[in-house]
Amino acid sequence: MTKIDTSRPESVLPTPSHTVGPFYGYALPFPGGGDIAPVGHPDTITVQGHVHDGGGNPLPDALVELWGPDPDGRVPQVDGSIRRDPATGGYLGRNGVEFTGWGRIQTDANGHWYARTLRPGALGRNAPYLSACVFARGLLVHLFTRIYLPGDEAALAADPLLARLDEERRGTLIAADQGRGTYRFDIRLQGEGETVFLEFQ
């Protein structure tokens, strides 16, 4: 450990801005994090895609966090649904009943992620969407975006955020319908087709 004399603030070097961390790996993995929907719920959808860097390469070590309202547009106010072993504290899984609206998914070796959640209802004047937060190497700060689902063109056209974007940029926020309740949403961190990211306050 390096000791630094902090009695003279002008002699203290700032922490390098290119260093992110410290990371506590044991706290990040969230087994079953993509299983957000209660088991057997009729409004369950699957949202899946890839996370790509600026060169178009898939990122095998990114984290995607999702949260969203229930099908009636209500933001869940329930406690977490994770079950832990009372003796060891180990992860047992979600309880399969409560819908918290939140999940954390790690991308696989091909940069792929997927989540089973409930189709979100509309919040106010917004078209239905899921919020997403991306953590990945090379990012000093995590990125926020939205995942809108296609199908209700009138709601998408009236959405205040989407209405401010040109068609090409708008398309980076709308998932592709793959049929049978499955949607694809690729996240591009930079470059051509870069996903629109939002400032969250």
Per-range role (PLM):
Residues 1-201:
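Beta-strand-dominated extracellular/periplasmic modules and repeats
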